[in-house]
Amino acid sequence: MALPSAWSVMRVVIPFISVLGLLGVRLVGASQDSGSVIPAESRPCVDCHAFEFMQRALQDLKKMAYNLDTRTETLLLRAEKRGLCDCFPAMH
């Protein structure tokens, strides 16, 4: 019976050791975090931050809509002016 080569054994052992190491680090980190719990009253309100972000985004959208509306109106006035000017022959 042929023995597995060192390379094939290492391909299995290294990922297995890595997974065990990550699980060990995660367990140690979880036990350290439990002592530093911040009370809910002193934590920033995630919903408040999301609301402020959405308010700023809405203000930006309103500004952009106003700018687009103004730009569209300017372009329409130019087109109307050009159309009116094309109707009248140039006076020389």
UniProtKB/Swiss-Prot annotation:
Q: Name one GO cellular component term.
A: extracellular space
One Gene Ontology molecular-function label: mRNA 3'-UTR binding
| Keyword RNA-binding on entry | yes
What processes in GO biological process is this protein linked to?
spermatogenesis
> Mind giving the lineage of the organism this protein is from?
Eukaryota, Metazoa, Chordata, Craniata, Vertebrata
Q: Which residues form the signal peptide?
A: 1-30
Q: This protein is called what?
A: NELL2-interacting cell ontogeny regulator 1
Q: Which cysteines are joined by disulfide bonds?
A: none
Q: Does the keyword NAD apply?
A: no
The scientific name of the source species is: Gallus gallus (Chicken)
The alphabetized UniProt keywords are:
Cytoplasm, RNA-binding, Secreted, Signal
- Functional summary from the UniProt entry: mRNA-binding protein which interacts with a range of target mRNAs and may promote extracellular matrix production. May function as a component of lumicrine signaling and may play a crucial role in epididymal-mediated sperm maturation and male fertility.
Pfam families the UniProt entry points to? Neuropep_like
Q: What compartments host this protein? A: Secreted; Cytoplasm, Perinuclear region
Predominant cellular place of this UniProt entry's protein: secreted
- UniProt record similarity statement: Belongs to the NICOL family.
